[in-house]
Amino acid sequence: MFKKWSKEQKFIAAIVLFVCLLSGLSFLFFRIFSGEKREVKVLKNGKSLLECSLQKDQKFLIMDEEVKEVSFSEGLSSLSEEERNPAKHEVNFIEVKDGKVSCTESNCNNQICVHTPPISKKTADLPIVCLPHGLIIEIVHS
């Protein structure tokens, strides 16, 4: 039914098997040790407002179309009443911590962005969206 392989056929099969094994291992090695870099990108109405590292813990205040890095203790309560007023300003606090990003506070009317769980490398497929403010927070390859 099966005929025996000649020495030449065995040698060629061994080389093909070795090349396949080597390419598979090199792919795995590259995938594991490449340290795939990802960063946070914040868009407002399609315009890029912020790009920052996912590795560094930091907090940002986004008011209208201006971005400012703030301390972790700051929030909506640290702003003036006029700045918090949703009729005058669109305010979001974005926090990058422990490799995750979240919208911790917002003065939008539905608060969906605040109640959306933090996103990380593992859940990077799903962005955080604040529809009333036209804000999209996503994790992208750098």
What are these model-predicted stretches?
Residues 1-9:
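Short, Lys/Arg-rich N-terminal segment immediately upstream of the first membrane anchor
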Residues 12-28:
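Hydrophobic membrane-insertion alpha-helices, especially the h-region
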Residues 23-41:
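Aromatic-capped interface at the extracytoplasmic side
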Residues 36, 72-88, 95-98:
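N-terminal intrinsically disordered, cationic/polar leader segments
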Residues 39-57:
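Short extracytoplasmic/periplasmic juxtamembrane "stem" segments immediately C-terminal to an N-terminal membrane anchor
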Residues 81-82, 109-119:
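N-terminal post-signal-peptidase region of extra-cytosolic proteins
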Residues 89-106, 133:
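Glycine- and acidic-residue-biased ligand/ion/polar-headgroup-sensing regions
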Residues 119-142:
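C-terminal partner/receptor-binding element of secreted or periplasmic proteins
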